[in-house]
């Protein structure tokens, strides 16, 4: 983190925030942070390493709890300080597995009990985080009470009563903080692999048209400016998936973060008409089917994902255009499934259809579009379509040098693809 570039401040209406203390350029790194605590999300358990969050076919299982898995002895050794105490808890609760929020809070508690300062709390600590308890519905509060009971059962091997918790630590409030302050950690392909707490980054407020973006390199978080930012200007990120209508965005922001968005995009319903193009009855059916597809995708069940996507795409070929966000999400899932199953020609067919909608819905420099364009360029390269591949790989590089930065591992991969493509063009 470079503290001279940003500072904490009190906004007029939105509580605390972060603002620029120096003029910022697109692509400038504003903040880097390891998490206070993180854990593999349930769907990726056993598929990615519990420490570096990278996928690998054969993972080493922790010999004690037999739940945590690692890609190497090196990762297992580095993970031990964070895993040591939860190991007993995971072992004792088998065959049940705790919700992600329970395992995450357990790791937070152990970290706070250790008392060692964390760089992730440099501007804002876990104790400073907003809980929004006074804005929660009774149903939400009951859900938190259930989590507290689950947590107490999960942690019983290490913590038998409240006196063993950190000073002034309230479990109900702690879960409320976790729910509205945790970040979904995505891998290079933008697949959800983990969940983590980055207290200082939680100072960032939401915008449906943000001036910053976040990407991850394993569990390491990088915050960059995506456009010019003036001194004193607030730094913002988008808390949500951009492929959502204004109504969907407002509902999720209300339900999860307890505020009403009144930005220009929400007030004018910007791009909503494009997003919902096509037969309403059909896209509502696809919207419902996507819940099952996303669940299968989260558990890396690619054959089932592809089968469902193919059936939907085939039946709706004349009724839903690719710009419809639910059709677009199905195409995207179909492409990812094909890539993971080694069906590269079919993956390119689906990926190519997403390019124009992605240009419309992810304008400017957005990491999701950058990664998508890179995927399509890489598929074209493997199919021998060198001029087309070069065009898309260059476009991906222009986007990702802003969103990811030259030191990100994905940019290194992209540069190698550009060099390979250039060599093939020269040789042909």
Curated annotation (Swiss-Prot):
Keywords: Acetylation, Chromatin regulator, Cytoplasm, Metal-binding, Methyltransferase, Nucleus, Phosphoprotein, S-adenosyl-L-methionine, Transferase, Zinc, Zinc-finger. Zn(2+) 1 binds at residues 49, 52, 71, 75. PROSITE patterns: SAM_MT43_2, SET, ZF_MYND_1, ZF_MYND_2. GO terms for cellular component: cytosol; nucleoplasm; nucleus. The modification N-acetylmethionine is found at residue 1. S-adenosyl-L-methionine binds at residues 14-16, 124, 132, 181, 205-206, 239, 259. GO terms for biological process: cellular response to dexamethasone stimulus; establishment of protein localization; methylation; myotube cell development; nucleosome assembly; positive regulation of transcription by RNA polymerase II. Its EC number is 2.1.1.354. It is an enzyme of class 2 (transferase). Residues 4-240 form the SET domain. Residues 272-428 are annotated as: C-terminal domain. InterPro entries: H3K4_H4K5_MeTrfase (IPR050869), Hist-Lys_N-MeTrfase_SMYD3 (IPR025805), SET_dom (IPR001214), SET_dom_sf (IPR046341), SMYD3_SET (IPR044420), TPR-like_helical_dom_sf (IPR011990), Znf_MYND (IPR002893). One of its GO terms (molecular function) is RNA polymerase II complex binding. It is found in: Cytoplasm; Nucleus. Pfam families: SET (PF00856), zf-MYND (PF01753). A zinc finger (MYND-type) spans 49-87. It comes from the Eukaryota. It catalyses: L-lysyl(4)-[histone H3] + 3 S-adenosyl-L-methionine = N(6),N(6),N(6)-trimethyl-L-lysyl(4)-[histone H3] + 3 S-adenosyl-L-homocysteine + 3 H(+). Histone methyltransferase activity strongly stimulated by HSPCA. Interacts with HSPCA. Interacts with HELZ. Interacts with POLR2A; the interaction may be indirect and may be mediated by HELZ. Interacts with HSP90AA1; this interaction enhances SMYD3 histone-lysine N-methyltransferase. Histone methyltransferase. Specifically methylates 'Lys-4' of histone H3, inducing di- and tri-methylation, but not monomethylation. Also methylates 'Lys-5' of histone H4. Plays an important role in transcriptional activation as a member of an RNA polymerase complex. Binds DNA containing 5'-CCCTCC-3' or 5'-GAGGGG-3' sequences. This is Histone-lysine N-methyltransferase SMYD3. It comes from Homo sapiens.
